Amino acid sequence: VKSGAYPNHARAYENVKSIPHYLKRVGYRVALAGKTHIDPKPVYPFEYIDEFAEPEDEDVPVIDGWRYPKVRNMLRESSEKKKPFCLFLCSNEPHSPYTKGDPAPYKETKLSPQQFNFHRQSYAKYLAEISYFDGQVGEVIRMLEEQGLRENTLLIAATEQGSGFPFGKWTCYEMGVASGMIASWPGNIEAGSETDAIVEYTDIVPTFLDAAGAPIPEVLDGLTLLPLLRGETNRHSQYSYSLQTTRGVNGYKAPFGVRSVVGGEYRYIRNLFPENEFSIPVSRNLMKETALLDETEKARAARYLNRPPEELYHVIKDPYCQENLIDKPALQETKNRLADALSNWMDEQGDTGRDVELDAHGRQANWYKRN
C-alpha cells in the first residue's frame, strides 16, 4: 500500500521509494498514525504521529469529544497553513484478541459456512471491533469537517485482509484476500455508487499521486483508480493476484506457499506444497477444537489443513469457496486461462514458486523478523 509494490516485494531495500518521497516532491505533508509494520525508516520517511495504535485491553477514552487529539492537531495545522496532506491512519482493528467495542448485539449473528459453532463468541467480538473501527473512521470524518477539509479530501477506507478465522487470513480463498474498500471525494465520486471492477492495494499509491497531480512512476505495479472512481469507466484490471506463505509465521511446521488469481467470476488457486499439511497456530487450534465433534465437522477441518495442488471456485455463486470446480470438464478452458495468467505473473515477478517459498524467510521485512 505504501510502496506501490506487490507483496512478494515485502522487504524494502534502501533504494526503494515510497509514497512520502513522491508526494513531498509536490509539496505535500505526508504522515502516518497507528500501526506501522514498515522498515527501514529511510524508505518510508513519514511524519509519525503517536496515536491510533491502541492498547489491546482497553478503548481509548473520549476527551472533549475526541479520541485522537494529535491527529486532529495535524489536520488543523494543515488547514491553517493551507498545506496539502496525505495521512495514513492505520488502525489495528479488527484483530485478535478482539477486546474493543460491544459484542452483545452480535451474539446471535449467523455464522458463515467457513466457521464452526465454537467460533460464535469470538465472531461476535470480531464484529464489535469492526463497529469500533467504523467509529474511528467517523471521528476522522468529523475532524475533516471541523477544519473545512472534507470537501477537498479524497478519503479511502480499506480493510487489510480477511478475518483470522479458518479459510480467511493466511489463505488465498476469497474470504482471505478479498478486502472491503470505500472511497469518498465530494464532487468527484458519486455518493452511493458501486463497482465490481477488480482493484488491488497496489493501485492506492498511483491513485493518491494522480489525485495530487503528481507524476506516476512507471515502476509502480498498480494503476490509478480515479477514472473508475469518477465513473468514467466500469473496468480496471483484468486480474488480481494474491500470494501467501507460512514461512516465518509463528509456529509453522512445513512450507505451504499459495499463489492465486481472480479474473471475472472465478478464482484459481495453486498450492505449491500440497504434500504438506497447512500448519500455523490457527490450524492446530482447529484440530484440537474439532477432535470431539462429528465426522462432518472433522472433514471440514481436514479440508482446511490438506489441500489439492489446484483449486477453482466461482466466487460470485460460492464466495466462501466450498465447491472446488477444478475437475469440471466445462471449466477446463477457464482453469487453463487463469493458470496461464498466474504463471505469467509469477514469471514477471521473478517468482519461481517452491524455490522462492523455501527462501522466503530470508527475504521477509526486517520488522517482521523482529517480531
Regions found by a protein language model. Give the residues of each.
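Formylglycine-dependent sulfatase
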Residues: 1-311, 319-347, 353-354, 358, ...
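C-terminal helical cap and adjacent loop that interface with cofactors, partners, or active-site loops
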Residues: 316
